[in-house]
Regions:
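M16 family metallopeptidases and their MPP-like homologs
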Residues: 6-119, 127-139, 171-173
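Proteolytic maturation boundary segments
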Residues: 119-173
Length: 173
C-alpha cells in the first residue's frame, strides 16, 4: 500500500484506487509488471507518471531508501506464515521449491535471506530494468484514450480486440 507508485497515483494524485508492481515467478527471465487501474480521463497522465517513476528508479536518480527496503522486508516476513496455513498453500510452497530447484531447507532460510537484503542489492536489481524495453498495455475506451496515449510516444501502438486479435480499423470498435 505504501509503494512509490501507489503513493503517487492514489495518495497524491487521486487518479487510482491502487498502483503496484511485482515480479512473477518463472524459470529464466522473470516478468516484472506494474498495474495502475486509473480514471479514464487520467490514463495518459498516469502513464507519464509511471514512466517517470520507473526511469528514475531504474537509473538510480531516485534510488531505493533504507526505509523502503525495510518496509518491504517487514511485509515479506509477515507474509511467510501464510505459506503454510492451508493444504493448498503448503502444496504451492513445495511446488515452488521443486520448480525452482530450491534446497530442502529453503523454508527455514527464507526469513534470513529476506533480512539479509540490502539497499545496494535492490539498486543493482533496479538497474536491470530497461524502461525503453517496457511493453505498455492500456485497457479502456479507445476513443477517450488513443490520442493522448499516442502523444506520449512510449513506442509502437498496437490495437487489439477483446480476443487479442489485431484491429485494422479502430473506427469499427
Amino acid at each position: 500500500f505504501s509503494s512509490r507508485l501507489n503513493m503517487n497515483l492514489r495518495e497524491d494524485k487521486h487518479w487510482a484506487y491502487g498502483a503496484y508492481s511485482f515480479t512473477s515467478g518463472a524459470l529464466g527471465q522473470r516478468p516484472w509488471m506494474a498495474f495502475a487501474p486509473v480514471q479514464i480521463d487520467k490514463t495518459a497522465e498516469s502513464l507519464r507518471e509511471l514512466d517517470r517513476e520507473i526511469r528514475q528508479y531504474a537509473s538510480g536518480q531516485v534510488p531505493p531508501s533504507g526505509e523502503e527496503v525495510a518496509r518491504i522486508q517487514a511485509t515479506e516476513i509477515r507474509s511467510l506464515p501464510g505459506a503454510y496455513e492451508t493444504g493448498r498453500a503448503v502444496m504451492g510452497t513445495v511446488g515452488g521449491m521443486v520448480r525452482y530447484d530450491r534446497p530442502d531447507d529453503y523454508v527455514f532460510e527464507r526469513k534470513a535471506r529476506i533480512e539479509a537484503l540490502d539497499v545496494d542489492q535492490v539498486k543493482r536489481a533496479a538497474a536491470t530494468i530497461d524502461p525503453d524495453k517496457l511493453v505498455w498495455v492500456v485497457v479502456g475506451d479507445l476513443k477517450q484514450t488513443e490520442a493522448a496515449v499516442r502523444a506520449l510516444d512510449l513506442g509502437e501502438v498496437r490495437i487489439v480486440d477483446a480476443d487479442g486479435q489485431p484491429v485494422t480499423s479502430p473506427a469499427s470498435m
